[in-house]
A protein has these predicted regions:
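C-terminal-most transmembrane helix of multi-pass membrane proteins
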Residues: 2-18, 145, 243, 279-335
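Membrane-interface helix-cap regions at the ends of transmembrane helices
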Residues: 18, 44, 48, 52, ...
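Hydrophobic/aromatic residues within transmembrane alpha-helices
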Residues: 49, 58, 62, 110, ...
Length: 335
């Protein structure tokens, strides 16, 4: 076997052709992590709604608000959308129906079994799935040092999430129910595919168009799911105080702003690196739970959580630096 530099693919050429801000591009891996941190900010606002609204009803309202905000963008980007092609449209449709709509519902449903440790430990399969899909779909190849470094990131997240009882996942997997595990695994697979397919679609369209399509195409899917679950009566439970400020805040911060930042950064970040940076989400969610009410649940903060957070941040910074400094990736070919 010998290693030869591979000529840029059509996909890579399209990505390179897109204009970007050099400062943003330089810190793209870090910005993916910032976007993932913003996703976790919805915990405070969502807690004010779960008393009388289901997860599906909350997601439908959030998606409808963001779609309303982005409709002018979608109208102005019709020329941009013509660059997608059949495979691009399939990718965007799968993101909207899978990563945006179905994955959130599956992940939330997995908690209904009361086996939280099993849900979180299976969620850690998301980076592995995304890295595998990036290898298959995008042809991404990582150098040998990437794998132990990624393992450190996974271990760091484990330290944060299971600081109180490191053996909790073992007990949960022994006593857990298959249904809860399958739901969590399904959500992880859909979110992982969303990262890879999003990176693929961004080779043809702008991050504004990608964000607009994700929410707009997901809305009818979510409406159908809500109708199947609750019927027309499911849309009568909303109150004005739900929208201002809670649903509006969810739509703007972890919804609109976070996804715009995420896709802008993802357009300059390999999917296999982005999926590691996305692990800032469970870490942030766990740390928010340590905040005093009403922001969090006043859970104790452990030294291992601080260490784990530092390790994950170090890995993300290293990946961001290596993305800029490393020479072009090569692929192994037959001698």
């Amino acid at each position: 076997m010998s290693e030869k530099a591979v000529a840029p693919s059509r996909y890579a050429t399209r990505v390179a052709a897109q204009a970007g801000n050099p400062r943003v591009d330089r810190f793209s891996v870090l910005l993916v992590a910032v976007a993932a941190t913003l996703w976790a900010s919805d915990a405070y606002f969502r807690n004010q709604l779960i008393g009388h609204l289901s997860p599906t009803q909350i997601v439908v309202a959030e998606d409808a608000l963001v779609t309303l905000f982005l409709l002018p963008v979608l109208v102005r980007s019709w020329r941009d959308l013509s660059h997608l092609g059949p495979r691009g449209w399939v990718a965007v449709a799968l993101i909207a129906a899978g990563a945006q709509a179905l994955a959130t519902i599956l992940f939330t449903a997995s908690f209904s079994y009361g086996i939280y440790a099993e849900t979180f430990v299976l969620q850690q399969t998301q980076p592995l799935i995304a890295i595998g899909l990036a290898w298959i779909v995008l042809g991404e190849r990582r150098r040998p040092w990437f794998w132990p470094t990624a393992a450190v990131a996974v271990a760091a997240v484990y330290m944060v999430v299971f600081a109180q009882d490191p053996l909790a996942p073992i007990s949960a997997l022994q006593k857990g129910r298959l249904e809860a595990g399958l739901l969590a695994l399904g959500a992880a697979a859909l979110w992982a595919s969303g990262t890879v397919l999003g990176r693929f679609a961004l080779g043809s369209i702008s991050f504004w168009s990608m964000t607009s399509l994700r929410f707009t195409l997901a809305l009818p899917v979510l409406v159908v799911i809500a109708l199947m679950q609750y019927g027309p009566a499911g849309f009568t439970h909303y109150r004005f105080t739900d929208f201002v400020p809670n649903l509006l805040a969810i739509a703007i911060v972890p919804g609109l702003l976070a996804l715009l930042l995420y896709y802008r950064a993802l357009s300059r970040t390999p999917a296999s690196l982005a999926t590691i940076a996305e692990m800032a989400f469970p870490v942030t969610a766990t740390l928010i739970a340590s905040a005093p009410p009403p922001w969090g649940f006043n859970q104790p903060l452990y030294a291992t959580q601080i260490i784990g957070t530092g390790l994950l941040l170090g890995v993300i910074v290293l990946f961001n630096w290596s993305k800029e400094k490393a020479p072009p990736v090569v692929q192994a070919t037959a001698a």
